[in-house]
Every structure is written in structure tokens, then in C-alpha cells.
Amino acid sequence: PLYSSAASDVYKRQVNTQQNYWLTNIANLAECNAPLFNYIGALSVAGEKTAEKVYGCPGWVAHTVANIWGYTAPGSSVNWGLFPTASTWIGSHLWHHYLFTQDKAFLKEQGYPLLKKNALFFLHYLVEDPHTGYLMTGPSTSPENSFRYQGWELALSMMPTCDRVLVYELFDACIQSAEVLGIDQDFRDSLKLAIQKLPPLKIGKNGEVQEWFEDVENAHPNHRCATHLLSLYPFAQISLQHTPELAEAAKKVIDNRLSAPDWEDVEFSRANMISYYARLKEPEEAYHSLSVLLRKLIQKNLFTISAAGIGGAECDIYIFDGNQAAPAGIAEMLLQSHEGYVEFIPALPKAWPDGHFKGLCIRGGGEADLEWQNSEIRKACLTARSDREFKIKLPGDPQQWRLKKNGKTIKNVLIDKDRVFPILLKKNDRLEIEKI
């Protein structure tokens, strides 16, 4: 059979490049982020020229297509190339690196300056919708997809949902970064005002999370891209704990895509399904998508592929993003920390009744080890890599567990109705949770 080595021999910032780094933080490989961050730094230099010449704005911006010479302007097809929040999406890795490592020096010297300049661009780029008062991006696209409107199939609109998600993430990351560093109060205040004027995530008449600001018909319900579900993963603007109605609407998006005739089942979209279902605490569905990826979308050498016939591909295309995004999804099945607390095996399938892991990482700066048997936790350990309060969700009856800190039993732990308890740990402290 024929295989192609690449889709178009460019770096794509509409999901593919980002997927290659979703695994790094949770898998304790944070040092592997360094090349990406150097790339973002170089990209921002070219992106300042694009911001000025294309949009007349300060700061920096980059779009979907990139190459080794730092191409940052809108390029290629309009239905995926005119995507200014691509820079925000790839820049979000800077903030996530800090969340997992708590590396304040990195945040001060590299992460926050890049995020701030990107946020500066969007503060000037956003326009107020005269009808709703919301701040809007645009014209922009929900990459590669399009909608039907008054008999037309269109790709460009104002504030597609993915843009709203990404601008919110950027502004929120900058606000939190500046608070951590104790700087830029006026800039923080500007971002807080702007973030309040962003439109909400909305549920359409079909019960799905809307992909566009207006409740329009999806022209390609079988499309491989579902960029608006960034809100579910890798971000957490939609979660079962905090936004249950939106979580149900996100699940409907996923279920409808998978059941659509001729769904475009490719390596990156199938790998995304693992993480989406893990976040929705649907273990069997997550495992099914992992199984499909391994049976259908991977070669004997373990390279993941985008199958021939999809997206105009003349033959199977090897793309690395599936190789990275799938294990990131597996990690999400085993450990989550995006809802404000640590949860062990939140999406454990029946096929994995016994197992263990060591050294997976959580937001807030910690490493977790876990052993389970007969689909039940036997022992969990959390080692702090920074001084802070951690929150842990206990599985089942709190009376079934013995808690130890550095080998000493902890008593009188305050556990809330959701079985979550807080604990203060110093760097290298070790919390143990054992089944009695």
C-alpha cells in the first residue's frame, strides 16, 4: 500500500501540533515542552508583523499554517486558514506547563510575556457586537467545517465557539499569571472587564453545544473536526462537575458525529474521542475509541494514519498526532485534575480490572502513583512537588480509607458531600491513601 509522510508538509496549529504536546505534562515529560516554547517565541516575532500589517493591532498573532520560516499570516483555504486564535491555542501550552510544574521562573521569563502580547492583540482585535454587546472575533472559522445559511454553505462568521473558548482561556491565563507574579494590575483589570463581555457557550435547538455563535445548521455533520469541543478537552470550560447541562450537550455532539453516515474517522479525531469520553466519565466508550484506533488507524510500525479518501487524501497519510493524543487520552482515563481536585481512575474500563501506574502528574505540581485490583483502588500516593493545598476525591465510602502523610496517620479530615478533602502539603511530602 501507498503511504504519504505528511498532509501538506507544514506545521498546522488547528489541532495537530497541539496534540503532539498534550501528553507531556500529565506524563511527567514537561522538559519535552522546551522545543515547542522556543518555537512559540520565534513565532511571536513574526506574529508581531502579521498583527501590525494584517490587523493594525499591537501584540502578536498566528494562524493555522506555519513553516520553518515562521509563517504567521492567514493562508491556504479560507475555511481553515483564517483562524487567528491558532496562536492562542498553541500559546495555551505555556500556561498549562506552569499549572503542572509551578515553575514561577518559567512563567515570569518566558510564559507570561508571550501570553501577554497575544492577549494584547486580542484586546485590540475584538469588536463589540452592536446587537448583543458581546465582544467578538471575526471574520474567523471553526477550522475546516462550514454551516448552511439562507441556502449558502459558508465557513466564515463572527465568534465561532472555538474562538470564544480560546480567547477566554488566554485572558484567564493572563489574569492568573499576573496574580501569581504580582504584576500588571491595570492590564489584569482590562482583561477582567473583557472576559465578562465574551458570549456564553450555548446549546442549540438540536441539543448540541453550538459550533458557531448563531444556531445554524452544520453543513458536514460527519466532519472529523469538532473544534468547539476544546471546551471539554484539553480545556475545562465544560465539565460534568461544574456544567452538567453543557456536558450533556457536548456528549450529544460526540454521539451524533460518531453515528453520522460516513463519519470521517481519522487518527486525530478518534484519539480526541478517547479524551472526550474520559472527561465525560464514559470508560467503555473511551476504551472503544482506543480499540478502534489500534485496529483501524494504526500501521504495523505503530504509526497512526489518516485514511485515504478523507479530506481529499489520495492514500493513507502518516500523522504523528494520533500517536501522542491517544496516550494522553489513556492518562485522562486513569487520572484527572481539571475540575479542581484529583480523581483516580475516573474512566476505568472493564478491560483493565487490575493495574498500576507511577509518576503521572497533576495540576498544582504533584506526582501520583496508583494500584488497583478488581477495578477498585488498593493504594494511591500523591507526592507534592510544590508547597500548596491539594484537593483529593475519595472513591466510595470515606470510612473505607486510611490516610497517611509521610507515614503518619491523618485524623479528623474534613470531607465534603462530594467526598473531596483538602490537605496542605509541602514540597516532597507524600500522601498515602489505602483501602482499610
Regions found by a protein language model. Name each.
Residues 1-7, 11:
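Single conserved hydrophobic/aromatic residue that forms the stacking wall/gate
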Residues 58-69:
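Sequence context surrounding c-type heme c attachment/ligation sites in exported
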Residues 79-81, 156, 222-223, 358-361:
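Short Gly/Pro-enriched turn/cap motifs at secondary-structure boundaries
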